[in-house]
Amino acid sequence: MSVTLALPSKGRLKEKTLAVLEKAGYKVVLPDDDRNYRARVEGEDDLDILFLSASEIARELGYGSVDLGVTGEDLVRETLAHADERVAIEAQLGFGHADVVVAVPEVWRDVTTMADLDDVAADFRQRHGRRLRIATKYWRLTQQFFSQKHGIQVYRIVESLGATEGAPAAGSADMIVDITSTGSTLRANRLKVLEDGIIRRSQACLVSARRSHTSRRVEEIAARIRAGLEI
């Protein structure tokens, strides 16, 4: 029975993932046609490669339709409810580092912590006649962090379909929850990260579907990739 390994379909994530696999002894033979999203591995007839977007990989792992995948831990936690029951993080791969953060306008000088933000949220409706609006693509992580961890209840999530960091300046939101690696884009949009506003530190990970844990082949592949990281 073959094992399906889902990999990022483009960009630096794809390049770095292929390098990690080659270091572990898995040389991926790319298709001649860029529109072909399947590939093979030299000498591994029972290992199928499937190229997907990072968010699709997280979803398919949750469904159990792929056995292993490389994606960001932020996407795993955001995409899958009860993620630990459905998937397992096999290895952190050491690239694709980014943080999911709470960021507010720099002009909110008195707001530096989540406790300050709680006060703002409680006061916002009385002052403005509406709830505090948070633009984000990470609604699950936002709800968990605001409501469950910090007890902040009076806010409204605004789905971000474009560049989240531009939402406050555009007037479609008051603040944001977004992913950042250097913080330069946030600073360019005059936003600041709250002192205790890091929701999750993320990086590219090798992830397995729980339903595949009975497969010795899946365990073998994961172990070989982990060993390759230590070379």
Swiss-Prot record:
MF terms (GO), sorted A to Z: ATP binding; ATP phosphoribosyltransferase activity
Function: Catalyzes the condensation of ATP and 5-phosphoribose 1-diphosphate to form N'-(5'-phosphoribosyl)-ATP (PR-ATP). Has a crucial role in the pathway because the rate of histidine biosynthesis seems to be controlled primarily by regulation of HisG enzymatic activity.
PROSITE patterns: ATP_P_PHORIBOSYLTR
Xref: InterPro entries: ATP_PRibTrfase_cat, ATP_PRibTrfase_CS, ATP_PRibTrfase_HisG, ATP_PRibTrfase_HisG_short
The protein's Enzyme Commission number: 2.4.2.17
Top-level EC class: transferase
Any single GO CC term annotated in Swiss-Prot or TrEMBL for this entry: cytoplasm
Domain notes: Lacks the C-terminal regulatory region which is replaced by HisZ.
This protein's UniProt keywords: Amino-acid biosynthesis, ATP-binding, Cytoplasm, Glycosyltransferase, Histidine biosynthesis, Nucleotide-binding, Transferase
Complex formation: Heteromultimer composed of HisG and HisZ subunits.
A biological process from GO: L-histidine biosynthetic process
Superkingdom of the organism of origin: Bacteria
Gene3D superfamilies (alphabetical): Periplasmic binding protein-like II
The protein, known as: ATP phosphoribosyltransferase
Pathway given in the UniProt record: Amino-acid biosynthesis; L-histidine biosynthesis; L-histidine from 5-phospho-alpha-D-ribose 1-diphosphate: step 1/9
Pfam families hit by this protein: HisG
Family stated for the protein in its record: Belongs to the ATP phosphoribosyltransferase family. Short subfamily.
Catalytic activity: 1-(5-phospho-beta-D-ribosyl)-ATP + diphosphate = 5-phospho-alpha-D-ribose 1-diphosphate + ATP
Major subcellular site: cytoplasm
Compartments (UniProt record): Cytoplasm
Transmembrane segments: none
Keyword Oxidoreductase among record annotations: no
CDD domains cross-referenced by the UniProt entry: PBP2_HisGL3
